[in-house]
């Protein structure tokens, strides 16, 4: 909340703040539009939920005015499954152990798809 409050105070009145957060459902690893596995998004959702509560509190306090909300898919593209698996090696979100052999065997481009919410907020 402290960082958010400092950010809002740094923006001139009627200036804009963009808030981008991951949202549920869980992200998925996909090949040719087919879901290979679901990725547990809870470690990231926990942080995102806390940020949402903080932004919503500023909206209720009329420090911010929510002007626009856009929920959309974000896809991260990988050359193959091994690259996807390597990208998750040091992340809080982990791929399911049971899906690792199948993912590593993918020799063609694949993606991770996740839902995101972009909110345009105006400082009051």
Model-derived segments and their meaning:
Residues 7, 17-19, 77-78, 88:
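Long, contiguous hydrophobic alpha-helical segments, chiefly transmembrane helices and signal peptides
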Residues 1-16:
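A short glycine-rich, Lys/Arg-flanked "PGG" loop and its adjoining helix->strand segment in the class I
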Residues 60-124:
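Conserved Class I S-adenosyl-L-methionine
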Residues 41-69:
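Active-site capping/gating segments
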Residues 15-49:
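Conserved class I S-adenosyl-L-methionine
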Residues 8, 42-46, 75:
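A short glycine-/small-residue-rich loop at the edge of a beta-strand within enzyme catalytic domains
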């Amino acid at each position: 909340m402290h960082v958010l409050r400092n950010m809002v105070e740094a923006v001139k009145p009627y200036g804009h703040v963009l808030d981008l957060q991951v949202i549920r459902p869980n992200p998925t690893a996909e090949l040719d539009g087919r879901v290979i596995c679901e990725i547990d998004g809870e470690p990231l959702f926990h942080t995102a939920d806390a940020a949402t509560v903080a932004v919503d509190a500023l909206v209720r306090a009329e420090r911010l005015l929510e002007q626009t909300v856009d929920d959309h898919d974000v896809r991260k593209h990988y050359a193959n499954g091994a690259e996807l698996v390597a990208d998750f090696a040091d992340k809080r979100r982990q791929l399911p152990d049971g899906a690792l052999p199948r993912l590593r065997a993918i020799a063609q481009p694949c993606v991770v798809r996740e839902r995101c919410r972009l909110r345009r907020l105006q400082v009051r």
